[in-house]
Amino acid sequence: MGFTRRRQAHEALIHRVDAELTAGVPVGSLDPELAADGIDEVLSVMWAELPAWASFSPTEGVIRIEATDTGNAWTIQLGQMSGTSTNTGKTYDEPSVRLCEPGSHEPDAQVRGSASDLDQWLWNRGNQRIERSGSRAALDGLAALIAAGVQ
């Protein structure tokens, strides 16, 4: 039940952002704690949670993502998810991430911003005021993952 409520809360939040963008009005502020949880859901559930039949291969680099207003931070390893679905037989080979344990990897790049800006950015709802530094290849890999969209 908790997973469903969490998912619905973030879906409703992004639908609100979409409605404001469509109406051409400024996007209202997002609750920082809800936005930070939204970041966590994208990174840990939507991108990093792999099916049992899939494997992960590291690629472009390690990125630290920091919400400057809440103090939350995540370190991710970019990579490829590959495998064949045991349900459909479809073969996958697509960008993915793996969450790193805090302090386990030195980041190649950093991304910083408010939780609200980062959450919207990960959902491909604009650049907001995101600070990026470090490896261009790692940042480009993350940008490609964001451009592919959250599913």
What are these regions (language model features)?
Residues 1-7, 14, 20-151:
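Structured surface interface patches that mediate subunit assembly and partner/cofactor docking
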